[in-house]
Amino acid sequence: MTTYHFIGIKGTGMSALAQILHDSGEKVQGSDFEKRFFTQEALEQKNITILPFSKENIKEDYTIIAGNAFSDDHIEIQKAKELGCKFYRYHEFLGEWLKQYTSIAVTGAHGKTSTTGLLSHVLKSAYPISYLIGDGTGNGHVDSEYFVFEACEYRRHFLKYEPDYAIMTNIDFDHPDYFTSLDDVVDAFQSMADRVKKCIVACGDDEQLQGIHTKVPVIYYGFNDSNDFQAQNVVETANGTEFDVFVRNTYYDHFIIPTYGNHTVLNALAVIAICHYEGISVEHMKQLDTFEGVKRRFTEKEIGSQIVIDDYAHHPKEISVTIESARKKYPNKNVVAIFQPHTFTRTKTFLKEFADSLNEADNVYLCDIFKSAREDSGQLTINDLQKLIPNSQLLSLKETEVLQEFKDSVLIFMGAGDIQKFQAAYEETTTKSTNFQD
């Protein structure tokens, strides 16, 4: 039996792919930095071996899958090439693996992970499926017909895939360390659209997606009257959001989702549209109302009188919709944003936009810019962002207890770096504090 060795197995996509291969009966192991990462709990639950990096991990008969964060001079990659091992980058292997299924790619600048999770949740109520979610969740099944996966546009990696279907949630300028402009991003999505084999489900409210040319049918969804699938009569309740769906101007059915914000309605519409196209019953679609969410996307807990939320938001638009969701769910509470910018390039590119979106919160705390593996220095500091946000404060890891003063408030920890360690430090301090009252 082939042994699949994952270099960087704790990465969100890598962890998910390793779990899928394991569940499909393959022999899987991997290596990574020894620092604990939130993805490794699922790997440990499945008894997938995680080793520290060492060239001794690599054997001649192994198939090697390397995370995209690691360069060719990594000790394990060098060893694999010396031994002549079968070698793939993550996106290359995924592109080959999904060919054995009816594949559904979920792509877009924002909303990929939540929509992938939502679609997987609905489909698995109807069929045995495999799915790969960008929060590190992966599930395989030996009898899978469908393979649902998150497809990232960064460095045009999604052009290694030829999916049967694609959901396109939106197009926006991001990853400024790679893309040069919005037009460059649009070009990447156009190339992706050219690779889809059966049908594209796209948000018709997105101006850029309206301009995509395709050789396959396109189903549009959204709030506008021109869409094939339209949400109307949207009502927010204590338990979530309810709305009616019209298919080509004809009433279809009423749906409930346990989330808030127009972006979550759009995610649900995308799922409804592709399920309708595939002939899946409305009863299965209504599993939308039992969706419990994905990791690091509006993940909530209560601490005393506070609601503490962990969210991956790292783009100005994502920050805005996360704050919007908090206000809709908790209309009588103050919203406190605790934000850690991710990469110097993104922070510099969107400095004013970050300030504008964070100003939508009642109070703002800023953590130092996260230095990613792709860059470790920049010409600006967190102070440049602070200057644009009146009354904002800097937050250090040793002083998180200042957040205790916000009684009966919503605290949102946002970022794609290690913002979770700030939340963990706050929770630990609060647990020990005798002064923190409900």
UniProtKB/Swiss-Prot annotation:
Subcellular location(s) per record: Cytoplasm
Enzyme class: ligase
Pathway in which this enzyme or protein is active: Cell wall biogenesis; peptidoglycan biosynthesis
Family the entry assigns: Belongs to the MurCDEF family.
Reported function: Cell wall formation.
GO biological process: one example: cell wall organization
Substrates-to-products reaction catalysed: UDP-N-acetyl-alpha-D-muramate + L-alanine + ATP = UDP-N-acetyl-alpha-D-muramoyl-L-alanine + ADP + phosphate + H(+)
One cellular-component annotation, GO: cytoplasm
Coiled coil regions in record: none
Principal location listed in the UniProt entry: cytoplasm
Protein EC: 6.3.2.8
GO molecular function, one term: ATP binding
Keywords: ATP-binding, Cell cycle, Cell division, Cell shape, Cell wall biogenesis/degradation, Cytoplasm, Ligase, Nucleotide-binding, Peptidoglycan synthesis
Keyword Magnesium among record annotations: no
Gene3D superfamilies: Mur ligase, C-terminal domain, Mur-like, catalytic domain, NAD(P)-binding Rossmann-like Domain
Official protein name in the record: UDP-N-acetylmuramate--L-alanine ligase
Binding-site list for ATP: G108, A109, H110, G111, K112, T113, S114
